[in-house]
């Protein structure tokens, strides 16, 4: 019976090791995932920018709780938590400055997603109205 326990222990160790490797592969960032030039970011699609933003956030200690659906997202693309704070994030990869509408949308998304904070992340600038 002792031999069977050793074999079972080794089998459990191997399965746990394989699971950890898989989990690291899925969750861990590779430097190339977030190592982009501004020109490369400007060429991304909106969805690519959302995924890139999520990768950068994850690499900086944020927990990605949800990537919202492409339409009907109530004004948030990513829901994250950081140090016990839940945050709604609106990603805007624009060629022009981001207007006040994006800010209003993500603020309204805070309530829908039960968040304490809201952020708009962009590759551009904000209009004066959006900054106020």
Regions picked out by a protein language model, each given a short descriptive name:
Residues 1-132:
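Mixed-charge (Asp/Glu-Lys/Arg
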């Amino acid at each position: 019976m002792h031999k069977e326990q050793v074999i079972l222990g080794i089998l459990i160790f191997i399965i746990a090791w394989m699971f950890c490797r898989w989990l690291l592969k899925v969750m861990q960032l590779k430097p190339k995932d977030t190592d982009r030039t501004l020109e490369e970011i400007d060429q991304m699609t909106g969805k690519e920018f959302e995924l890139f933003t999520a990768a950068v956030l994850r690499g900086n200690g944020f927990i990605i709780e949800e990537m919202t659906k492409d339409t009907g997202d109530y004004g948030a693309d990513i829901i994250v938590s950081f140090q016990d704070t839940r945050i709604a994030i609106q990603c805007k990869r624009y060629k022009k400055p981001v207007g006040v509408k994006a800010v209003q949308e993500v603020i309204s998304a805070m309530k829908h997603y039960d968040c304490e904070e809201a952020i708009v992340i962009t590759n551009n600038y904000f209009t004066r109205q959006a900054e106020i």
